[in-house]
Structures are given as C-alpha cells and as structure tokens.
C-alpha cells in the first residue's frame, strides 16, 4: 500500500488475504442492541479490579451479569467493583470477558464512527446520540459485538463460573459512614503516598470531629493531611487501606463526592 500526499510518501507491506482465517458461521443463542457508551465505559472502569495473576482464571476478566438489569463486576480477591447499569439483555446469563479483550473493545469502540440518527436535522443530535452496539452470545462460549456496520469483535470468553459478587458485599448498616469530596481525598492520599510506599503501602484514615486525617508511616518518617468531611456517622472511627487501591478508585472520578463505609468495628 502506497500513500502519497503533498509533503511525502509512505509504503507499507501487506499480507495475503488468504492468510487470514475466515470467521465460521456460528449459531446465536441470544442477541440484543445495547447502549455502547454505558456498557463499554463500565467495563473499562472495572479493569483495575481484575486479578493480574493466572492462578484464578475466573478473576482474570470482567464479569457481565446479563438480563434486566445488566451488571458489571470484577475482583482480584482483595477488592471488587460492582455496577448496576440501566440496560437489559434478552437472556439471563453470566459471562467473563478477558481483561485484554476489554481493552480491545475500548479501542475499537473509540475508533468506530458514530452512526447518525436517521432523522437528524442538525449536528447536535448526531454528536449527543448514544452509540448503540449489537451483542450476541454465539458459538461455544463466545460473544460477538458489532459496532455499527464498520467493525465486529468476536471474543473467546473465560471458562468457568464467576463468584457470586453480591454475596461478598457485607449486609447491614455500616459501623462508620462518611461522605467526602473525592478530589480532596485523592489529593490527600497523593500527599502521603511517598511515605506510604516507603513503608508497607498502607494509608490510615481517622474520622473525628467532622474531620478526616489521612496519614502514612514510613521507615523513618510520618506524614498526615487533614480535611473536612461532608457528613460522617459513627465517628470517632478509623480504618486503613492500601494507597494504590484508594487511588485506583478515586482517580478520574467524575463525581464531586464519594462515600466511605466500613462494616467492621472501626475504632
């Protein structure tokens, strides 16, 4: 393939089309049209919680609980993410999408052109329209996602049954519940993370008198940052978390506040 433009040229080698396998016809178990903007964003948001080791394959991907509503979950044995989406699929099923396949879906979805509404009379409906994708459970443990008429992705799903994610969520009222400004908490954790990293990676959080004190202890130093909370019930109380877990959760949050709950005695 040769490309020529008014400032230069470029040549790229090509492969013979017969070297690429033809996708076989596969029976479809169930299919439906889904809001791709919501689904893909939720799957990408779950990626940081996926296990990175191969010892537990069912934790190495993002779980989709299909039905009405669709749920997205992931966990690595230490933490988990669970999202309930306002979407539906005509068949109730649980599938596990490999982590690398989720990244591929995000890339293809970002590059696929929007399909404008058939009755759009201005640019606004085209720009703001939700991007729909067609999803089908097909073949033997596979899922196919069609991005309009321009691209399709067929994924081999992870074999096995995912955990019962909701059973891992503690029931009952939390011992301590606090609402804080997410960007402010993120800044406080970043302020102490160097010392936390020098120690055991732990960030301590103490709730008292309407304040939250975030601190870390290293080998030869200690650092802390104090911030106001919006609302706290159950104080005084304290808890501790790995700083990377906190930052993975807080990083890029589009909301101004976040709620922290502990279900074990936090004193």
Go through the PLM ranges and name each one.
Residues 1-267:
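Structural preference for solvent-exposed beta-strand-turn elements
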């Amino acid at each position: 393939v040769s490309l020529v433009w008014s400032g230069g040229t470029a040549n790229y080698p090509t492969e013979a089309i017969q070297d690429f396998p033809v996708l076989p016809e596969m029976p479809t178990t169930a299919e439906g049209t889904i809001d791709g903007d919501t689904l893909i964003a939720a799957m990408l948001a779950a990626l940081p919680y996926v296990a990175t080791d191969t010892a537990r394959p069912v934790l190495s991907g993002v779980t989709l609980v299909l039905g009405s509503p669709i749920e997205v979950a992931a966990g690595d044995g230490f933490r988990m993410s669970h999202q309930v989406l306002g979407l539906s699929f005509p068949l109730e099923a649980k599938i596990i999408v490999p982590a690398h396949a989720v990244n591929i879906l995000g890339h293809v979805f970002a590059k696929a052109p929007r399909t404008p509404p058939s009755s759009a009379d201005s640019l606004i409906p085209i720009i703001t329209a939700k991007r729909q994708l067609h999803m089908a459970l097909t073949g033997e443990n596979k899922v196919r996602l069609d991005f309009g008429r321009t691209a399709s992705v067929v994924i081999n799903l992870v074999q096995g049954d995912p955990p019962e994610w909701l059973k891992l969520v503690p029931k009952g009222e939390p011992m301590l519940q606090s609402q804080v400004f997410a960007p402010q908490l993120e800044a406080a954790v970043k302020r102490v993370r160097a010392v936390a990293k020098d120690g055991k990676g732990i960030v301590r959080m103490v709730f008292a008198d309407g304040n939250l004190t975030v601190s870390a202890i290293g080998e030869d130093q200690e650092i802390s940052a104090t911030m106001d909370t919006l609302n706290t019930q159950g104080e005084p109380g304290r808890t501790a978390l790995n700083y990377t877990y906190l930052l993975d959760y807080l990083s890029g949050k589009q909301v101004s506040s976040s709620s922290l709950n502990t279900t074990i005695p936090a004193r």
